[in-house]
Amino acid sequence: MVHSFLLIGQSNAAGRGKLEEAEPLDTCGGKLKVLRNGRWQTMYRPVNTDRSFSGTCFAESFAKAYSEIHPDVEVGIIPCADGGTRLEQWECGGLLFDNAVNCAKLAMRTSTLVGVLWHQGESDCASERYPFYYERFQKIMRALRQELNIENVPFIVGGLGDFLVNCSILADLENYIYVNEALQRIAKEEKNCAFASAVGLGANPDNLHFSAQALKEFGTRYFDEYQKIVSEEIIDDNAPKENGSIMSEIELL
């Protein structure tokens, strides 16, 4: 049995942790999986290959924490995050939204979708964008739940890093606090939603992306928030599934 999580958002969801700074990936004896070509493979880095320079991501430590609590299942990540994307690019009917829905539906043929992990907002810190973050994201979240029929599945949103005030790559990043306020409001008002704080987490030298060590901690924060709202009925899905695992040695070549 595979319990899966949809990973969506921009670069800090995809992960830009330096591979050389990260501890070796613990796949929990091969129980941690990643969706590739519609099938489950043992997790490897980078988990979310949106760019050639993708790195570690918080989904790694999240999946490990989940596996430790649920050792009788495999834990699969559905990687659909895309770096640098604005909220408007995730709207219902757009390419990113449809890709996430299609990948999730494919994964749901071989797994039980038990959570959505979202991190996005750096690209929406501009003064003409952040005032509308709450309304836009609320529509996206509700549309995603409807498309996948996951009204009761936990949706965890992560805060933007406070190191953004020191970043010179993008303008208006000091407005991250307003995006965080919108995310916290969403988590408070929407059912089965929680906010994972990024306060105090470290960054790469660019002061835009979380460091490998920070991402490891961030994943545990996501999991802690997930545990607070998940219900047993979500994870106790005994509906028959297709076999999406690698079936022969030659497929590993």
Q: Residue locations for each model-derived region?
A:
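Cell-envelope and extracellular/periplasmic
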Residues: 1-253
